[in-house]
Regions:
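Loop-helix junctions at membrane interfaces
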Residues: 2-193
Length: 193
């Protein structure tokens, strides 16, 4: 007999197991947070003179907003990226990263929803999410670093732009691969929050 996790109509039956769609979304958000953390920490290209690094984690943040929706995506992208800074010893950046990456996922998800509702191309929405990443990462980190380090913060702008462009390209490549997975496609196409 299948296990009923919630007693409402908002559940999905799969191979004898019943799963609430909210629980499924939470599980996917946790997976995206873990992916964002690992993608940020696994491939690091140091940026000279800044003490920072370029990484592919931004692509996961963008895709979290698109696939999970703005709210769950914001939580997954922000928490996963901030965990990477925490584990990596970049303690001062943990709250900054939480906010900036959370906003990237939030805005990417909102753009995706708006474009999908108006019948526009979903792939264009992914690219616009990548552009959002470039603006928020380069601008957001510059503003925060300006308060921390003064005018020397400008040195990080080119590296943050390169990181954002990398996030755009990687998310554009990964989107069709992920959307081909039925559960991921269903989550992305039905996303409401």
């Amino acid at each position: 007999m299948p296990l009923l996790l919630y007693s409402n109509d908002n559940y999905e039956r799969k191979e004898g197991f019943v799963m609430n769609s909210n629980l499924k979304k939470i599980i996917m958000a946790a997976l995206f947070a873990a992916l964002a953390c690992v993608a940020t920490m696994s491939i690091r290209i140091p940026t000279p003179g800044t003490g920072g690094y370029i990484h592919p984690g931004d692509a996961i943040v963008i895709l979290a907003g698109i696939i999970l929706g703005p709210v769950y995506g914001m939580l997954a992208g922000g928490i996963g990226s901030a965990l990477s800074d925490l584990i990596g010893g970049y303690f001062v950046y943990v709250p900054i990263t939480l906010v900036i990456k959370g906003l990237v996922a939030l805005v990417s998800g909102l753009i995706y929803q708006k474009m999908c509702r108006s019948g526009k191309n979903r792939y264009v929405a992914v690219i616009l999410g990548g552009i959002t990443d470039i603006v928020f990462v380069a601008g957001g980190y510059f503003i925060c670093e300006f308060f921390l380090y003064g005018s020397g913060a400008a040195a990080s702008i080119p590296a943050n732009i390169i990181q954002g462009v990398g996030g755009l390209i990687i998310s554009a490549v990964l989107y069709p691969v992920l959307i081909a997975i039925p559960d991921v496609r269903q989550a992305a196409y039905e996303t409401k929050n």
